[in-house]
């Protein structure tokens, strides 16, 4: 019985490793597709929050672009993709989950609120140069957030550009459909 259980556990472990390996390859393909889009648009970095146009934390599948690009399924987190780096910022509720889900993806985990963790703005300032462009999907940022981001980065000669459509809708890879409108 013990040997049987060990074989089941080993088989399950091999299956999980296979899934994670292939999921990481898919994540890498998605990041490569996003980077190709950014290059075409003249954008050097893209910020992908976990929100929808209502700035909700829990969103319909269509608005889970951060989950789609990173594979991280926690409800809170922000991904930043540059031409050569990728990072995910999340809070302590999700540190362990993020470590597991990002493993092998090439996305670095930034643990928010820890003294050694750079903020997203610090990361952008450190990794971009003057005349760089940071892209956002303006539908999922508040006006206040977008203006603050724009003003802060402008001090370093970095501009912010809103891309009208969700970034994953522009890639050649499959993504969730927009939810139907309610007709109450």
Annotate each PLM feature:
Residues 3-7:
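Acidic, Ala/Val/Gly-enriched low-complexity intrinsically disordered segments
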Residues 12-15:
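Intrinsic disorder
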Residues 18-20:
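Low-complexity, intrinsically disordered or signal/transmembrane-proximal segments
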Residues 24-129, 133, 137, 141, ...:
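N-terminal accessory/capping or targeting/presequence segment of soluble
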């Amino acid at each position: 019985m013990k040997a049987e259980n060990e074989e089941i556990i080993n088989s399950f472990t091999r299956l999980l490793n296979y899934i994670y390996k292939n999921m990481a390859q898919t994540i890498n393909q998605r990041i490569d597709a996003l980077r190709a889009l950014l290059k075409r648009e003249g954008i050097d970095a893209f910020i992908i929050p976990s929100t929808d146009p209502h700035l909700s934390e829990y969103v319909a599948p269509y608005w889970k672009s951060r989950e789609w690009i990173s594979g991280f399924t926690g409800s809170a987190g922000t991904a930043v993709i540059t031409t050569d780096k990728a990072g995910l910022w999340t809070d302590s509720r999700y540190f362990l989950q993020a470590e597991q889900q990002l493993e092998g993806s090439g996305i670095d985990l930034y643990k928010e609120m820890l003294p050694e963790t750079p903020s997203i703005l610090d990361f952008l300032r450190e990794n971009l140069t003057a005349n760089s462009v940071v892209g956002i999907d303006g539908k999922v940022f508040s006006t206040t957030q977008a203006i603050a981001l724009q003003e802060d980065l402008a001090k370093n000669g970095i501009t912010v550009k809103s891309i009208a459509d969700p970034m994953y809708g522009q890639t050649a890879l499959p993504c969730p459909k927009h939810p139907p409108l309610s007709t109450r």
